[in-house]
Amino acid sequence: MWDYTDKVLELFYDPKNQGVIEENGEPGVKVATGEVGSIACGDALRLHIKVEVESDKIVDSRFQTFGCTSAIASSSALTEMIKGLTLDEALKVSNKDIADYLGGLPEAKMHCSVMGQEALEAAIYNYRGIPLAAHDEDDEGALVCTCFGVSENKVRRIVIENDLTDAEQVTNYIKAGGGCGSCLAKIDDIIKDVKENKAATNLNNKGGSKPTNIPNSGQKRPLTNVQKIALIQKVLDEEVRPVLIADGGDVELYDVDGDIVKVVLQGACGSCSSSTATLKIAIESRLRDRINPSLVVEAV
């Protein structure tokens, strides 16, 4: 039995704004509809919006849905949330906002709030006469989940927007991986890639300290091992360690053997599943950039 909030149960037993908005020629307003999901897959939502043309405001909204308790409650909540908003304001409503309005949803039911957000986007784009294919970048790229027709771009977007960390969460949000399960490994790879890209971005943004000033006498002679170790330690202390420490980790220089730099990852970095990304992106790339492009970093 799912643990639903009182608000979810209230809108399930007594849903607001259920039904259709017909286009009846009323002056100054226009009706548009957005549809997502599939009855064959177990969830479908049709969202209707009535828009005051002059102000671009949503004056009424109704829904029709085929789905569970969470689907009905999420759809009902959405129709209440968007009334009085301009179309641009409504486009900012996220699936998280819908879930928050309901006081939370079981994670296995988060896909219902995602459907609401997508139906709203579809309705607004239909109102504006923009073909859905023109804005739906989620449908581009390789298909990851053939059971539910979910592309790599959509998986990637949902992972980034909701800070998801495993394939089970992705299944809960957009159903990908919930059929035969053959795509779960691919979903894990996408999550890992998102984490690595985020780590690289954080390093660049937080690499807070100014670039280490590496002396350059203009001489062509290679660095001695003592000089190399001193420079590596300087870069680690001034540019790498502050970033890692801020995230609960750290790194210690263990040894330098030619171009092989051996380090010990500590704290969160030592137990993190993305430790390889930390080595290659956060440490190795920085040392190569500052000292020598042939340096290779290894953990011991």
Swiss-Prot record:
<dbReference type="InterPro" id="IPR002871">
    <property type="entry name" value="NIF_FeS_clus_asmbl_NifU_N"/>
</dbReference>
<dbReference type="Pfam" id="PF04324">
    <property type="entry name" value="Fer2_BFD"/>
</dbReference>
<dbReference type="InterPro" id="IPR034904">
    <property type="entry name" value="FSCA_dom_sf"/>
</dbReference>
<feature type="binding site">
    <location>
        <position position="183"/>
    </location>
    <ligand>
        <name>[2Fe-2S] cluster</name>
    </ligand>
</feature>
<dbReference type="GO" id="GO:0005506">
    <property type="term" value="F:iron ion binding"/>
</dbReference>
<dbReference type="GO" id="GO:0051537">
    <property type="term" value="F:2 iron, 2 sulfur cluster binding"/>
</dbReference>
<comment type="similarity">
    <text>Belongs to the NifU family.</text>
</comment>
<dbReference type="InterPro" id="IPR016217">
    <property type="entry name" value="N_fixation_NifU"/>
</dbReference>
<dbReference type="GO" id="GO:0016226">
    <property type="term" value="P:iron-sulfur cluster assembly"/>
</dbReference>
<dbReference type="Pfam" id="PF01592">
    <property type="entry name" value="NifU_N"/>
</dbReference>
<feature type="binding site">
    <location>
        <position position="147"/>
    </location>
    <ligand>
        <name>[2Fe-2S] cluster</name>
    </ligand>
</feature>
<keyword id="KW-0001">2Fe-2S</keyword>
<comment type="function">
    <text>May be involved in the formation or repair of [Fe-S] clusters present in iron-sulfur proteins.</text>
</comment>
<feature type="binding site">
    <location>
        <position position="180"/>
    </location>
    <ligand>
        <name>[2Fe-2S] cluster</name>
    </ligand>
</feature>
<dbReference type="InterPro" id="IPR010238">
    <property type="entry name" value="NIF_FeS_clus_asmbl_NifU"/>
</dbReference>
<dbReference type="InterPro" id="IPR041854">
    <property type="entry name" value="BFD-like_2Fe2S-bd_dom_sf"/>
</dbReference>
<keyword id="KW-0408">Iron</keyword>
<keyword id="KW-0411">Iron-sulfur</keyword>
<keyword id="KW-0535">Nitrogen fixation</keyword>
<feature type="binding site">
    <location>
        <position position="145"/>
    </location>
    <ligand>
        <name>[2Fe-2S] cluster</name>
    </ligand>
</feature>
<dbReference type="InterPro" id="IPR001075">
    <property type="entry name" value="NIF_FeS_clus_asmbl_NifU_C"/>
</dbReference>
<dbReference type="InterPro" id="IPR007419">
    <property type="entry name" value="BFD-like_2Fe2S-bd_dom"/>
</dbReference>
<dbReference type="Pfam" id="PF01106">
    <property type="entry name" value="NifU"/>
</dbReference>
<feature type="region of interest" description="Disordered">
    <location>
        <begin position="201"/>
        <end position="220"/>
    </location>
</feature>
<keyword id="KW-0479">Metal-binding</keyword>
<dbReference type="GO" id="GO:0009399">
    <property type="term" value="P:nitrogen fixation"/>
</dbReference>
<protein>
    <recommendedName>
        <fullName>Nitrogen fixation protein NifU</fullName>
    </recommendedName>
</protein>
